[in-house]
Amino acid sequence: MARELSQEALLDFLCQAGGRVTNAALLSHFKSFLRDPDASPSQHQHRRELFKGFVNSVAAVRQDPDGTKYVVLKRRYRDLLGEEGLQRPREPPAAAPSAGGAAPCSPRGARRGEPPQQQPRRRRREKEPEEEPAGAAARAADAACNGLPGSDSRRAPGKGGGSKGSPGQRPPVPAAAAAGAQARASCAAAKTQGRCCWECLQNNLAVLPGELGALPHSATAEEKPARALPAQDDRGASREREEGALAEPAPVPAVAHSPPATVEAATSRASPPALLPGPAPRGDRPELLTPSSLHYSTLQQQQQRTREWVARHPQVPEARDQGPIRAWSVLPDNFLQLPLEPGSTEPNSEPPDPCLSSHSLFPVVPDESWESWAGNPSLTVFRSIRCQLSLQDLDDFVDQESDGSEESSSGPKDSPGASEEGLQVVLGTPDRGKLRNPAGGLSVSRKEGSPSRSPQGLRNRGDGHISQQVPAGANGLAGHPLKPLPWPVPKLRRSLRRSSLAGRAKLSSSDEEYLDEGLLKRSRRPPRSRKPSKAGTAPSPRVDAGLSLKLAEVKAVVAERGWRHSLWVPSGEGSAALAPHRTSEHKSSLVPLDAREHEWIVKLASGSWIQVWTLFWEDPQLALHKDFLTGYTALHWIAKHGDLRALQDLVSGAKKAGIVLDVNVRSSCGYTPLHLAAIHGHQGVIKLLVQRLASRVNVRDSSGKKPWQYLTSNTSGEIWQLLGAPRGKPIFPVYPLVGSSSPTRKAKSKEISRSVTRKTSFAALLKSQHNKWKLANQYEKFHSPREREEYSD
């Protein structure tokens, strides 16, 4: 049953169903939302339309010849099936008992209510030669695809009786059977390419037939199943198996791309108590697994898969800590090096090996605080990464549902405290009390034995994402060089949005992958390009520490809110404040107004001078306060209103209060009070500002205009001259600026005009005579008025 009605929930279900699910099964999965008895008819209609939009955006409805309708994932989104594989939909735990009697090799397509003729088609689709990077866990029961003989096939925990709370309760298989299975398992890819296929890697067949001895350390392999792998299927477990296999000097082609640092970490560090008898004590060298213990480890892993299935598909929708982060992910060849999610480990399970920590690729000193973590309740499991992908054409859905938050539209909103926290970019932790939150994806400091809430931040995912440990004894991330990375360094990219939420950052492991824009916000900062930064780390503009991300050393990038966060350092050496946070430099202009400042601006704008003076005498400094929108001060507002008495009262009150008024203060548009008085034609205020307060008349505003250029036609010449208008006629003269000319000057000008005469030419004389002749002879040809009228008609 779906936990929420969202785009990610639909994608998650379709991906788990292999991209194809019956219409009835899809409606049944979301029945709690579409047919909620507590919802009103309007809510039902709204949810129905929302659900239709979600389906139409990523899938299409196809009808088989027998009349069964299927919802099929669109072709452009088929690459999302890389994680879940092409397996058929698995039944939720409620329907699991119905499939309990299925044969071990029965196809995943055999679901309740599906016609028998559909099963061969599903079997053919399952055997298509496509890689399944993380879907092998879902196909563990399909023996033919994994290279295991049918005698050694294991029942899928979710399909058999292992649903709900007691998954995977089966008798152990004899050691001889497991050894025979390993010896007979020869993958075609191992012969042709030198390494096994994904299925073999994920079923502990990553070694060639002649190299069965190079197996993981027993304690390491035994404690791996104790970890839940939320939303990542088997990729993390496969990575651990690879890291364990590297502990032996024997060359293993299947894991040749693993980082050298992992070899050192796996061979030199101590191992914690194991789950089986005879664990290697701390400080001992790793020992090899026997085939029986290897098979038991495999059974434990399948139990964890069952727990993972139950956690991802609860019967009752539960609230999540945080909506999943959406990120487009392209899986490289070495994506098995994937950080695990220890947050969902069962309370009664052993803590994971520090040398194979979920974030670790570098040596780490175990910390005693890890034992206290084992008692903590398991955190909420989030869904598969690929079903949380950020598809660019789905951004509208997500943004509309998120209402300005940076969480996914699928998840319930965080608590207010968590949504306002800033980013902590932490490169690993040896302190096992500091957990990686599966919802937030970052380790945070453990307080009082319980994992603290992680801020929404980096989610270290597959595809070469490396979250690296800070070595013990380091007082800061910059003080201890780390080992070079075996593949390209993760790049940092940001998507900045103007918001009041805290900023966060993400790491991208390749040029094709970027972590989504819609998740990170920077407080009141302009948006930037989505292109990954080619310069490595681009710290936030508010970070004072010089932090960089290089090939040989990885440091922290801190984006902060208005308070301080402390990033921790290993081995209990205390926390080092690596994040110099924003000071009070933003307070003056960016924080909201208090009640008094707001009332001051409102009363000034409305011209309520009595209330203005009351507020002024309560706090005279308000006279210097600028409106955050227009940049107007009290002088600007009074000049705009043109109240001469109010201006006089303000000037006298400021003198009494000892406040120096700046009469030339400029607004957001560059206006001085004199500009506003000229624009609105308040001549009395202009005189007072210029003559008494010595306001400057040659100050230009943002348009390059001086106050006199705003004067209108009804302005007196005195004001024109007072504001320094150019000599001569003004633009809109009403009467001359200078006194009237003397009578002698007027008489002289008349005489000059009279003396200027024009002599007529002979042509003009002839023309005048010709016109007279035409007028005299115009009507002579018409002898009577009647003829003249007829001609005119």
Curated annotation (Swiss-Prot):
Residues 220-244 have a biased composition (Basic and acidic residues). InterPro entries: Ankyrin_rpt, Ankyrin_rpt-contain_sf. Keywords: ANK repeat, Phosphoprotein, Repeat. The modification Phosphoserine is found at residues 106, 271, 761. Residues 83-185, 219-290, 337-360, 396-543 are annotated as: Disordered. Residues 521-533 have a biased composition (Basic residues). Residues 96-108, 134-144, 175-185, 246-273, 407-417, 498-508 have a biased composition (Low complexity). It comes from the Eukaryota. Pfam families: Ank_2 (PF12796). ANK repeats lie at residues 630-659, 669-699. This is Ankyrin repeat domain-containing protein SOWAHB.
